């Protein structure tokens, strides 16, 4: 059994970016849900602003990209032992089940760090494309609770249930990530044919009984999650190439991979009324919000959206990952919220069951910033002009204040002698203050233009981090 296989991770990461441009492009049209409970929950979700994403599976033992190294797409590369023999490699990958034992698993520790940083919802990978279930499914033995998995002997082996329960106790909204494709399942990648790419490796139209078995398998797994894991707010479905297709042809890209999402949604909402469905990139009534990946739209969108982004370079645990600096994470959150979106920030647990210590430090830095500036994030909505130069705006939903985030180029904020910007649709301001400071500011507001004089002491102070946030009360 290979304990470690080294991959060309830089190439893999770049290739995934190129792949994402084709398969993970955000939808540009939107269908408002007919169900009033779904609309209500969407409003609640939009108020959360900041969520935690976690990609975790047996692949963390090798420190490689989640699932994709067993995919035969021509953009995938792998090096090291077995790299020249796909089927031997895939067998070794699947045997990672027999050594997976994340003994340091402690979801309450994650809850404390996430809550302090201002996160309010969590989305966890119950199953990624490789098909390994991180929950106690009855549909397959390729799962964390199977006796072949060492961690199955742990009383907390059903990690999906443990994660959901721990976060729910602290009032987080709960999201179940679920991969529609399943590269372990014989009814998706049938061993009669070699897999050619990430798609189903046979034409469902030619083998309808086999495809029906896969549809039933998918339905049953989702029903398990919806019926046996407490309150779930979001069903986050990945693998957008698995969708109905009006086109026909021999190219797998044109195969009709229809899972009957209407049936899945009806069943799911019978257990979870108001459930937010995120059939990402598919567009239509089952994509209740859109999910730009690793990018921030350059302007507000007219429908609910969420940027999903990694805290480092990779979605999965990779040793020596390059974590984004705290200033980038905070300022990305500001930009997203100013444009009406949510940030779903991914932190990947390692093979031992815990996060990299750097991830905890990043969340602590965000927590420290939130202690001063959260007023401009929560209970806010976008307001024109949204941004001007390095200043980004939000408005309180109670229509009593506008917040202007002056973004710093360095971690320590050095404000200039004066700051000026336009303020739209406010006839009169009552008060202008700097969050985190008790010093009074001199300011002038005429014809929609606000000019703020910054005292010398504040200009020289570096007590503020990442942004200087002005509160404009009216």
Model-predicted regions and their roles:
Residues 21-474:
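Mature catalytic domains of secreted/periplasmic carbohydrate-active enzymes
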């Amino acid at each position: 059994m290979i304990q470690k296989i080294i991959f060309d991770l830089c190439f893999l990461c770049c290739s995934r970016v190129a792949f994402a441009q084709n398969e993970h492009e955000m939808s540009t049209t939107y269908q408002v849900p007919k169900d009033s409970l779904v609309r209500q929950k969407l409003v609640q979700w939009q108020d959360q602003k900041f969520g935690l994403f976690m990609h975790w599976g047996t692949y963390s033992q090798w420190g490689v990209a989640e699932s994709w190294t067993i995919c035969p797409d021509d953009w995938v590369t792998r090096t090291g032992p077995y790299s020249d023999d796909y089927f031997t490699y895939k067998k070794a990958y699947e045997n990672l089940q027999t050594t997976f034992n994340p003994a340091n698993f402690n979801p309450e520790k994650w809850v404390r760090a996430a809550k302090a940083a201002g996160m309010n919802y969590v989305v966890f990978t119950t199953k990624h494309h490789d098909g390994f279930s991180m929950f106690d499914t009855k549909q397959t033995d390729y799962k964390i609770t199977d006796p072949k998995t060492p961690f199955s002997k742990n009383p907390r082996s059903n990690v999906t249930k443990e994660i959901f329960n721990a976060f729910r106790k602290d009032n987080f909204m709960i999201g179940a990530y679920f991969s529609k494709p399943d590269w372990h399942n014989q009814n998706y990648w049938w061993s009669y044919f070699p897999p050619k790419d990430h798609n189903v490796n046979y034409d469902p139209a030619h083998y309808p009984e086999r495809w029906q078995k896969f549809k039933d398998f998918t339905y049953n797994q989702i029903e398990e999650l919806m019926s046996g894991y407490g309150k779930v707010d979001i069903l986050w479905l990945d693998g957008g190439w698995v969708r109905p297709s009006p086109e026909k042809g021999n190219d797998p890209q044109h195969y009709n991979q229809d899972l009957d999402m209407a049936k899945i949604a009806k069943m799911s909402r019978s257990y979870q009324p108001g459930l937010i469905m995120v059939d990402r990139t598919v567009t239509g009534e089952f994509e209740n919000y859109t999910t730009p990946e690793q990018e921030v739209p350059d302007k507000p969108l007219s429908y609910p959206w969420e940027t999903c982004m990694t805290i480092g370079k990779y979605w999965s645990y990779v040793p020596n990952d390059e974590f984004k600096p705290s200033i980038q994470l905070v300022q990305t959150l500001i930009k997203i919220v100013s444009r009406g979106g949510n940030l779903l920030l991914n932190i990947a647990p390692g093979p031992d069951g815990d996060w990299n210590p750097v991830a905890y430090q990043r969340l602590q830095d965000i927590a420290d910033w939130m202690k001063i500036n959260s007023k401009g994030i929560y209970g806010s909505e976008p307001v024109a002009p949204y941004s001007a130069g390095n200043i980004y705006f939000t408005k309180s939903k109670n229509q009593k204040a506008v917040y202007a985030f002056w973004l710093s180029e360095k971690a320590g904020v050095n404000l200039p002698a004066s700051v000026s910007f336009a303020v739209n649709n406010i006839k009169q301001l009552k008060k202008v203050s700097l969050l985190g400071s008790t010093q009074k500011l001199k300011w002038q507001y005429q014809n929609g233009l606000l000019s703020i004089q910054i005292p010398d002491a504040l200009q020289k102070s570096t007590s503020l981090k990442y942004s200087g946030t002005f509160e404009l009360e009216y």
